[in-house]
Amino acid sequence: MHKHQHCCKCPECYEVTRLAALRRLEPPGYGDWQVPDPYGPSGGNGASSGYGGYSSQTLPSQAGATPTPRTKAKLIPTGRDVGPVPPKPVPGKNTPKLNGSGPSWWPECTCTNRDWYEQASPAPLLVNPEALEPSLSVNGSDGMFKYEEIVLERGNSGLGFSIAGGIDNPHVPDDPGIFITKIIPGGAAAMDGRLGVNDCVLRVNEVDVSEVVHSRAVEALKEAGPVVRLVVRRRQPPPETIMEVNLLKGPKGLGFSIAGGIGNQHIPGDNSIYITKIIEGGAAQKDGRLQIGDRLLAVNNTNLQDVRHEEAVASLKNTSDMVYLKVAKPGSLHLNDMYAPPDYASTFTALADNHISHNSSLGYLGAVESKVTYPAPPQVPPTRYSPIPRHMLAEEDFTREPRKIILHKGSTGLGFNIVGGEDGEGIFVSFILAGGPADLSGELRRGDRILSVNGVNLRNATHEQAAAALKRAGQSVTIVAQYRPEEYSRFESKIHDLREQMMNSSMSSGSGSLRTSEKRSLYVRALFDYDRTRDSCLPSQGLSFSYGDILHVINASDDEWWQARLVTPHGESEQIGVIPSKKRVEKKERARLKTVKFHARTGMIESNRDFPGLSDDYYGAKNLKGVTSNTSDSESSSKGQEDAILSYEPVTRQEIHYARPVIILGPMKDRVNDDLISEFPHKFGSCVPHTTRPRRDNEVDGQDYHFVVSREQMEKDIQDNKFIEAGQFNDNLYGTSIQSVRAVAERGKHCILDVSGNAIKRLQQAQLYPIAIFIKPKSIEALMEMNRRQTYEQANKIFDKAMKLEQEFGEYFTAIVQGDSLEEIYNKIKQIIEDQSGHYIWVPSPEKL
């Protein structure tokens, strides 16, 4: 049959459907397309890639001109018509029937002759029905999985979700399915509320995507039209068991640790309070009913659902010797089900927690626990009903005898961390990376002691020897391990006590066994985003922050971890948390980059950067090359060719009495600049440039341009660093002087500057600290979505240029802005300028970290 097959057998519908199909075959017209300014009205959001070989694709709404909605008919094989081959069922999966057991009707059919169809069409012909798997109705279930049909209407930001997987790049080993990896807040999927992370997409309208390459699924979603029907499969949530436990406090209090709560979520999107550790010898361990992963619902008569972490801690502390607990225990799982994607954030082991006991501290620092760390997979927000890793199951389910485990290295390495190796205490598994080879095998457990690796005896090995054995083990690794939770618990307690001793020592005396820095307290500006929920190595409660945030580091004595609090425009936050030190950030980033090299920053102006039309004889390239990028490092000259790794910039608070200049960089900057001046002419203005070009009759000196008397004079001023940027066009010099910018700033207006990133540093040197905002596109597809006249090639060039811009000038940006629409980006920029317009600002400090 042809693609324009009619949706039913009646003559009335045939011609309508065939005509629509013929229209679809007409090629789109491109004659009216215009090549936009590369940094004109365009934007960003879309494709993204994960870590360690995982990938995802954010789905924008349709690129280019909006096409006519597709009217592809559903093909119904009968005894007379031979339709397309039905989709091949995925082995081990049930194939859902889209509309129950009755005949399928094309939803866009306007024909009223359904009775004619039912009389004229025989029942569908089934070949070898015994070989087919049982069908499932949509919005039904088979006990293990639930199937649902979801209809979404494409919004301004597309469908509002990201996907990963496919035959060519499985998101889950041995499963070619297409999985939802992210629901974008405010998008169509989020507003609808039915689609969830880890849902497996089986069908997009009439296209079977249960076993296709990733690009085919992306294409199906892009071409689905404004209304998209999805058939998805998801795991049935395991029911929780509610239990009441009475505990009698002992010398170690209640004997367990907790994490979670409002503002301190243990699992992103979940405010519940979870048990994260059972302390050896404590009341909880002796009672035996509480386990890691249990969810606390109430303490005595106090409800612990949707409360702050501090409230939960206070409720547990303010109890008598006999404590009544109400807990929810996770339900059982189908452990052998390989079609459920792993939950990359369901491990309740290494996140921040607080001990509930009489003498425990609620925070500690230190980097005693040395680890072999492997790259993490992408974070996927979980639900309470995520699969529970094997290492969270009941202790009695695991043998205490040595056992052989065979792991195959993947893109995430082996997927576990080790500790130990001092004084013959043994090598222990301290962390299982969710979704990594160790986790997916289900054989390795936190608390396992590693006895050997590929025949190499590690019973008395040092940490370095064990790490080396694991690193050189090859792709297939045979591990002999023995579950020794008591020994591991004693080791953990020793580490905890040692950390507290060192922390107390460093806090009280400023010295101790930690290698300390002379700087005990300082203010820094973050030059990267940090999400504490994605850091499995945190020794205590972490503090998340974004690029450009000001942090008050109240203790920088440790080499690996600092204590800090956020500084907002309204003052300092009360919450204190742990952040990675500058040294740790740089060490991790260098390990990630490995042999990847970037072009060294030069600080010279490029001829085609921000002055379209200027010749290659761009004047500043020869005369401003002395201005180079500074780094916050004090690295030796032998490393001069390496890019500085952005971590923190020391800052100091300064009072100013002028309106700060504004520099917008990235796609859509011209549109934003124009809108700011148009909407707020009393707040924003532009400065008068200088030129050696002769004045024309209708031009006014000092109003249209500052006309310089001689070329020699302007060349001298450029060499004397009186210009933030200059260039040559048609043998005439043009430039923006520092004095012109200062004149606007001292009148109380923000001077909007259309300059390159090099100007930021020159303004700082002139004590005119600009508000520099970088518009960072989310993806090539998002650029095309915000400017539908762009071709893919044009958007790709703009995206690449933006990435190079960030790489070259990232350390000088005040803030980085992203959004799904121009309006969203514009509103964010206005808010940033408002926040940065006070009389007190944070400026770079000459101090070294």
Curated annotation (Swiss-Prot):
GO biological process assignments: cell-cell adhesion; chemical synaptic transmission; establishment of planar polarity; establishment or maintenance of epithelial cell apical/basal polarity; nervous system development; protein localization to synapse; receptor clustering; receptor localization to synapse
Residue segments, region Disordered: 32-101
Modified residues (Phosphoserine): 157
PROSITE patterns: GUANYLATE_KINASE_1 (PS00856), GUANYLATE_KINASE_2 (PS50052), PDZ (PS50106), SH3 (PS50002)
Chain positions with Phosphotyrosine modification: 705
Pfam families: Guanylate_kin (PF00625), MAGUK_N_PEST (PF10608), PDZ (PF00595), PDZ_assoc (PF10600), SH3_1 (PF00018)
Keyword Repeat applies: yes
Domain annotation Guanylate kinase-like: ranges: 659-834
Residue stretches of biased makeup (Gly residues): 41-53
SMART domains: GuKc (SM00072), MAGUK_N_PEST (SM01277), PDZ (SM00228), SH3 (SM00326)
GO MF annotations, alphabetized: ionotropic glutamate receptor binding; kinase binding; PDZ domain binding; phosphatase binding; protein domain specific binding; protein kinase binding; protein phosphatase binding; structural constituent of postsynaptic density
Keywords (A to Z) from UniProt: Phosphoprotein, Repeat, SH3 domain
PDZ domain boundaries: 149-235, 244-330, 404-484
GO cellular component, one term: synapse
UniProt-listed PANTHER family: DISCS LARGE, DISKS LARGE HOMOLOG 3
Subunit architecture: Interacts through its PDZ domains with NETO1 and APC. Interacts through its first two PDZ domains with ERBB4. Interacts through its third PDZ domain with NLGN1, and probably with NLGN2 and NLGN3. Interacts through its PDZ domains with GRIN2B and SYNGAP1. Interacts through its guanylate kinase-like domain with DLGAP1, DLGAP2, DLGAP3 and DLGAP4. Interacts with FRMPD4 (via C-terminus). Interacts with LRFN2. Interacts with LRFN1 and LRFN4. Interacts with FLTP. Interacts with DGKI (via PDZ-binding motif).
Protein family membership: Belongs to the MAGUK family.
Function: Required for learning most likely through its role in synaptic plasticity following NMDA receptor signaling.
Protein name: Disks large homolog 3
Species: Rattus norvegicus
Lineage, broadest ranks: Eukaryota, Metazoa, Chordata, Craniata, Vertebrata
Chain's gene name: Dlg3
